[in-house]
Amino acid sequence: MSDINATRLPIWGIGCDPCIGDDVTALLTRGEASLC
């Protein structure tokens, strides 16, 4: 899980807040990035 977050955070951190990194990862897993 840490490896996935570490890979996603730098990329999505630009458009999304790092604080919601976990939520973003969950959305990406479902294929839904509506928040971004």
Swiss-Prot record:
There is a cross-link at residues 12-16 (2'-cysteinyl-6'-hydroxytryptophan sulfoxide (Trp-Cys)). Pfam families: Amanitin (PF24112). Keywords: Thioether bond, Toxin. Processed by the macrocyclase-peptidase enzyme POPB to yield a toxic cyclic decapeptide. POPB first removes 10 residues from the N-terminus. Conformational trapping of the remaining peptide forces the enzyme to release this intermediate rather than proceed to macrocyclization. The enzyme rebinds the remaining peptide in a different conformation and catalyzes macrocyclization of the N-terminal 8 residues. GO terms for molecular function: toxin activity. There is a cross-link at residues 11-18 (Cyclopeptide (Ile-Pro)). InterPro entries: Amanitin/phalloidin. It comes from the Eukaryota. Residues 1-10, 19-36 form a propeptide. Coiled coil: none annotated. The typical symptoms of amatoxin poisoning are gastro-intestinal distress beginning 6-12 hours after ingestion, a remission phase lasting 12-24 hours, and progressive loss of liver function culminating in death within 3-5 days. One of the few effective treatments is liver transplantation. Belongs to the MSDIN fungal toxin family. Toxin belonging to the bicyclic octapeptides amatoxins that acts by binding non-competitively to RNA polymerase II and greatly slowing the elongation of transcripts from target promoters. This is Beta-amanitin proprotein. It comes from Amanita phalloides.
